[in-house]
Amino acid sequence: MPTHSRSRDRYGGRDSDREARYDYDYARRRYATDDDDDYDDDELEHDLTERRYRRDGYRPPRESRARGYYERDAEGAADEELLGNERDPGPRASRSYGDDYDARRREHSRAREAPRRSERHRDRDREGRSRRRAYEDDGRHRTRDGRRDRGRESDGEARRSRRREAGRETAARKHRSSDSTNSASHLLSADALAKLGAQYEKEERRKREIAKDAAKAERKRQKKLAVVGEETRALRDPPGESHRDRTKARVASGAYLEEGRSPEMRVRHRGGGGPAMEARWRKEGSWGGTMDDSGGGRPFWKRKRWIGLGALIIILVIVIPVAVVVSKKHDNKSDPADSQGTSPGKSNLDGLSHDSIPAYAQGTYLDPWTWYDTTDFNVTFTNETVGGLSIMGLNSTWDDSARPNDNVPPLNEPFPYGSQPIRGVNLGGWLSIEPFIVPSLFDSYSSVSGIIDEWTLSKRLGSSAASTLEKHYATFITEQDFADIRDAGLDHVRIQYSYWAVATYDDDPYVAKISWRYLLRAIEYCRKYGLRVNLDPHGIPGSQNGWNHSGREGVIGWLNGTDGELNRNRSLAVHDSVSKFFAQDRYKNIVTIYGLVNEPLMLSLSIEDVLDWTTEATKLVQKNGITAYVALHDGFLNLSKWKSMLKNRPDKMLLDTHQYTIFNTGQIGLNHTAKVNLICNDWYNMIKEINSTSTGWGPTICGEWSQADTDCAKYLNNVGRGTRWEGTFSLTDSTQYCPTADTGPPCSCANANADVSKYSADYKKFLQTYAEAQMSAFETGQGWFYWTWRTESAAQWSYRTAWKNGFMPAKAYAPSFRCGDAVPDFGDLPEYY
């Protein structure tokens, strides 16, 4: 009897010897299992941690799983980095309030010891205060003493003028004298003396104008003080403290930076100056046109303006060419054959009035004027709901006559499940974020910031999360993708969504409900191109597996822990709403598979609890009118275990299994030909058997698989985690799991991660054969869904990239290789990639 696809026993003992040394902390840890070869062993009572079908290196989350982020304030850490040049020199560690206070106290002490150290503060006393304001704040009579000061200034100016006149007369006598002691070769001519005198007079006039302006500003200030009176004095800063001193030390936040106002912060430093403050001062009329206390000279911000402008030009000269090069490189690497438009469409709002939206709905997710993209949405307002879920954006009519190709019936005719295989793709990383699919959302954060999943990303983005993620929803998958899916010969789409498309709870930072609108539009695009839909709840309340693609990496809180029962009920409430919505007539022909939960980790959860919930959820959605097949995941149990499980289940249920070789250290190290043989021998028979109601469980689909033969894709094993292929995955073991690990040369991810334009013909031939072998094996069951349709840079995980670059069949229903055919020769293809 063939071994299970996820078994490592037949490949020698090195896997089991190293099992205890492997951490289970990786993003798609759902895949590698240490399965039992005995298909007849159906006992479920053994301790889960002792089962031979345990996933490779798995340890229960509550024992060994690292959360992957620190409990420290991640937002503060990033602000430290972003504002590093603004702070005092020193370590970048986050400082406490006490540290900030000590720093300010030391700065204050320096002001007392050396008030003239800085030219900008020569008018301050040893206490760091403005000499003028210090005296005023000590209780002077402002009106009387102001007149006295102006009188003293006038007397002083008169004395200085007499001294200057005396000096000029002395110089003139000297140059008029014929005395040899007063003669020299460098004596100036009369014209030169005249020019010098004119220049001197011009300088004097400028100084007098400055003094006049200063006096005018002082009179204006005194006048304002007299009008405001005691109220103004009550609001005045205490002696020795300016307004700037009261500003909080931290002036930056993630949201502030997201708004594009970081240049303002660089000017503001720790709370003073900058465009925002200057505009406010002008508006209040309390700014005399300068930031200099003396009232003279060019204002600080004007002196800096030209310097800043010059620096900005230099930066742009450097940054723009680099950005263009990086952008071109990124586009070529992710999908060289195509590029997605990023300009939002809002033309269907033309001619409409915002007043057509009720006041209570304006500014909410029901207001199309707040949407990033309104293309193909019905923007006529409605607050109607079904199952508590909005229908806003939908048209009232639909057409189910389309078909994707001649091999598939149109939507208004039943699909022959059981006699014709499903050929579909997933839309992973779109409405449920996954780092390795969209690394650009995570690349801007440092490794210590702890931004590792949608929870931490949404929390970090704060008020900008909605706009950032909606732009991703609108641009990552568009109508053109559904047209391409049809043209590739595919006929089904498995669409991921998470519970926050429906509702959020407690302190959830997730963006609520916006993805719901894009889910509904995606289904309408599927309808247009004749594609049937498999709904896949990828994240449910509490997390069903503790992995990043469930929304939050860490502890499993569904059916487990303190809030396990609470989240159980919440997940049923989500299905109650969603099932009522998709039980509408408009979805009867198109939503043909209804998923319950993606990849519940039954190696950690109570199997009985999961099965009880599955039965209850299935009965609930069917009671609400769902006639589609209901899909449940195998939970990573050995498929042979399912032969005796849920025998008395409700009707129309599918078992969903996800198969990958690269997360199993016994399989990732096979050479190219051996991997194809594994698929066509072991997997082929395994799927065929479990799909039978007499020898297995019954109708079985493969909801996820990939042609990737390495785990080299960036962030695939978690943000910041290495690879098994190069021996950098484990924190304690550097063993490489690749075909040439023992003989050399060392395996490298360079070729697997290279731009697809650099793939050799032999490598493309292998990748296509490897994919077609899996298609053949999974079609012995109900069919398959490839993971995934599109990625930003992981070419071997993108059906779209492979299809457009010649290492997927031109039509999914017409492969060039099937199991039973001779495995082709892959030429001189090296085994180390």
Swiss-Prot record:
Residues 183-196 have a biased composition (Low complexity). InterPro entries: Glyco_hydro_5, Glycoside_hydrolase_SF, Glycosyl_hydrolase_5. It catalyses: Successive hydrolysis of beta-D-glucose units from the non-reducing ends of (1->3)-beta-D-glucans, releasing alpha-glucose. The chain crosses the membrane at residues 306-326. The lineage of its organism: Eukaryota, Fungi, Dikarya, Ascomycota, Pezizomycotina. The active site is at 599 (proton donor), 704 (nucleophile). It holds the Pfam family Cellulase. Belongs to the glycosyl hydrolase 5 (cellulase A) family. Residues 1-305 are cytoplasmic. Residues 34-45 have a biased composition (Acidic residues). This is Probable glucan 1,3-beta-glucosidase D. It comes from the Eukaryota. It is a single-pass type II membrane protein. Residues 337-346 have a biased composition (Polar residues). Residues 1-228, 331-353 are annotated as: Disordered. Glucosidase involved in the degradation of cellulosic biomass. Active on lichenan. It is an enzyme of class 3 (hydrolase). It is found in: Cell membrane.
